[in-house]
Amino acid sequence: MADDTAATPTPDLLAHGSATLSRVSVDAYNAELRTPDGFVGDRASKRAFQAILDDWRERVRKMGEDPLGEQPSEEISKKQLDKLLLEGDPEAAGMVHSAIEEFAQEFAAVIRRFLRLKEWKDVERIVVGGGLRQSRIGELAIGRTSVVLKGRGHAVDLHPIRHAPDHAGLIGSIHLVPAWILAGHDSILAVDIGGSNIRAGIVEFHSKKKKDLSDADVHRLELWRHSDDAPKREDAVERLIEFLLDLVKRADKDGLTLAPFIGIGCPGVIRADGSIERGGQNLPGNWEAKGFNLPQRLREALPTIGDHDTVVLMHNDAVVQGLSELPWMQDVTHWAVMTIGTGLGNAHFTNRALADQ
């Protein structure tokens, strides 16, 4: 993809990767900004944070002992870093702080680059998701990035995404379809496919409490860390289908009424027919192959849910994760999401009702 461009979705309410959803327009997603050194988003990924921490450790080791010990940075969990930050000796905490500060500066530079895109020029708020967000170090990095941006004249608010990363990519699926598809039901099946994990779950609406679906939550979650097993594509699809069939039984056992809908969040640029144009390189096997269509495979495996034909819709995973924040984005017109994970997922939205006004 050329510099400063992003995927432009198709304008069809029930198409995969659609630009027009019931409450928002998806203006752009999966922007792949490049420099001579590589993708801009790689400067604000989980690997980037680990590389920054490694660099600080190497510098300190030249002067004496590493306060973090001998454990490789990639093996130090977010919980361990959080504990070091709060309870570690001053030098260990200072090293973690240094990594957070440098990462925040890099993240701010990445966001400034995104703000130069025409689709992003009016953004008022950015929600930040992904695995790093689910930690105190991630929250501090987001907060520090927000301060850096405002200090440099950018009136953009940054907020950590509300839901846990394992849940946000599932909950967002309830906003992929018009409300009439969900009417008379209390839950859906949702799938979140990532470079390391595949998640499937039952998302319960709780719409009697909150009509805007802000009380929606994950009733049941199945998670498989496929990166540990390195499966073939067909094995991964079959495992996912097993998850979904088990979840249908679980919903019935728990007295839930599933809507005839499966929502999918998947990395990459999603064509209107449900195939993946590009961006699936971290998935198990070749998901961009001609003739492979995940929504079609799931429809064949679950042709009906209850008494109705199954509707399956797939969109980019960052888009779906961002949609989980929709109930809390009603006071702004233009907003965006960035997900810090294997790479940097991204999407920009416009609230349709506010834009019309």
Explain the meaning of each model-derived region:
Residues 2, 7-69, 73, 173-174, ...:
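Gly/Thr-rich phosphate-binding beta-strand-loop-beta motif of the actin/hexokinase/Hsp70
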Residues 48-62, 76-89, 128-131, 194, ...:
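Short loop/turn segments at strand-loop or loop-helix junctions that form parts
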Residues 64, 114-122, 149-153, 178-183, ...:
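Alpha-helix termini
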Residues 70-122, 160-166, 223-258:
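Adenine-nucleotide phosphate-binding core of ATP-dependent small-molecule kinases
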Residues 100, 106, 118-148, 268-270:
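Glycine-rich phosphate-binding loops at beta-strand->alpha-helix junctions
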Residues 123, 184-187, 258, 308-310, ...:
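Short coil/turn connectors at secondary-structure junctions
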Residues 134-164, 224-238, 261, 270-335, ...:
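Glycine-rich phosphate-binding loop and adjoining helix at the ATP-binding site
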Residues 174-178, 185-262, 267, 295:
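Conserved small-residue-rich
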